[in-house]
């Protein structure tokens, strides 16, 4: 359009959601705290069930398949596997965890072997 009524992204697309290209120190800290909180809940549930001589398949499979936050490498904490992001070098097939939808509510601890 010409004149005073030039179109902008905000007018055409509604809200513009800007995602920073890397995680800030505060976001990394909060992400680590969320991972530790999940580990703590799993440990509490597991010990409570063991005291009663019971077990839960879901909790046992979580412990068997997922690393605790203290054992995860920074690459696994802050990036996740994606087929669509194919870059050169170390970041090939990985993208920042904050660029995935609902990254605070979904687990990002499982990656294919070799990636």
UniProtKB/Swiss-Prot annotation:
Amino acid composition bias (Polar residues), ranges on this chain: 103-115
Pfam families, per the entry: L31 (PF09784)
Main subcellular location of this protein, as a coarse class: mitochondrion
Subcellular location: Mitochondrion
GO cellular component terms, semicolon-separated: mitochondrial large ribosomal subunit; mitochondrion
One function term, GO molecular function aspect: structural constituent of ribosome
Keyword entries, A-Z: Mitochondrion, Ribonucleoprotein, Ribosomal protein, Transit peptide
Transit peptide, residues from-to: 1-23
KW Iron (keyword) present: no
Superkingdom of this protein's organism: Eukaryota
Region (Disordered): 88-115
InterPro entries reported for this sequence: Ribosomal_mL60 (IPR016340)
Biological-process GO terms, alphabetical: mitochondrial translation
Annotated disulfide bonds: none
Family designation: Belongs to the mitochondrion-specific ribosomal protein mL60 family.
Quaternary organization: Component of the mitochondrial large ribosomal subunit (mt-LSU). Mature yeast 74S mitochondrial ribosomes consist of a small (37S) and a large (54S) subunit. The 37S small subunit contains a 15S ribosomal RNA (15S mt-rRNA) and at least 32 different proteins. The 54S large subunit contains a 21S rRNA (21S mt-rRNA) and at least 45 different proteins.
Record's function text: Component of the mitochondrial ribosome (mitoribosome), a dedicated translation machinery responsible for the synthesis of mitochondrial genome-encoded proteins, including at least some of the essential transmembrane subunits of the mitochondrial respiratory chain. The mitoribosomes are attached to the mitochondrial inner membrane and translation products are cotranslationally integrated into the membrane.
Stated name of the protein: Large ribosomal subunit protein mL60
């Amino acid at each position: 359009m010409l004149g005073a009524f030039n179109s902008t992204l905000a007018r055409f697309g509604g809200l513009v959601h800007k995602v920073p290209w890397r995680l800030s120190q505060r976001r990394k800290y909060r992400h680590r705290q969320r991972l530790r909180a999940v580990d703590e809940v799993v440990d509490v549930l597991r010990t409570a069930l063991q005291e009663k001589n019971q077990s839960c398949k879901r909790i046992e499979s979580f412990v068997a398949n997922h690393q605790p936050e203290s054992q995860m490498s920074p690459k696994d904490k802050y990036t996740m596997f994606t087929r669509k992001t194919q870059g050169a070098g170390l970041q090939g097939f990985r993208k920042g965890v904050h660029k995935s939808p609902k990254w605070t509510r979904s687990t990002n601890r499982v990656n294919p072997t070799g990636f």
